[in-house]
Amino acid sequence: MISHISYQTSKIPCDVYSKKTSLQLTLKEKTCDLSDITVVSGKKQESILGKGVRAPGDVAFHNVRNTKYETGPLFVVNKDYYVKTAKLRVQKCTFASCTIRLIIYEVKGTNFMPVQHRPLYVRLSEISDKKDLSVWIEEPLKLERNHKYYIGVAVMASSGNGEIHFPAYFKKGCVRNLCTDRKKNLPVTLGVSLYGISAKHLQ
């Protein structure tokens, strides 16, 4: 199975590639309807999603170069928001280098549909004590009232052996297998916060 945020998922039977040393693939671009044009009020950023209440233990990725799992919170917003900043706390990181990916999805039934054109990437080096990461979101990113969303956090690259730990929080979360799309809901997850400003449709 081949998957990328910008293209439709493609499944290739084993007998097509099992006897070949190389395989040329052509992926079909994924097209999505964009949100309506929005006018953003000139207000100070407010909290859209909080981390939750601290839980015992951590959420951790061990000895991964490119994990097949992502995890993060599920949430519903109470009004239309224009997201500007995502924040994430790392408890510790023993990788010499590590790249974390964040994607915000809209949840429609059992389907997770990205609402971003480009994922957010954060590059880290070794961290011995907790550190708060703040990511500025440049593209227009609108969350709609009463819609359900999911923030998937995954380790996409690392220097090899090591681990990265995120503090655990009591908040409804989900672990998703990126290869099979299987999902498991959990009562705790890592702490991601979103900040932005309320938006209204252009009349």
Task: Give residue ranges: language-model regions.
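Extracellular beta-sheet/turn segments enriched in Thr/Pro/Gly and aliphatic residues
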Residues: V16-S41
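Surface-exposed coil/turn segments at beta-strand junctions on protein surfaces, enriched
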Residues: S18, V76-K79, F95, E126-K130, ...
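A short, solvent-exposed loop/turn motif at the edges and junctions
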Residues: M1-C14
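Exposed aromatic-hydrophobic patches
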Residues: L23-T26, D129-L141
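Beta-sheet-rich sandwich/jelly-roll-like modules and their strand-loop junctions
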Residues: D33-K108, K148, A154-Q203
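Solvent-exposed serine/threonine-rich low-complexity stretches and specific carbohydrate-binding patches
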Residues: C14, V115-I127
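Short structured motifs
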Residues: T9-S10, P56-D58, Y69-P73, K87, ...
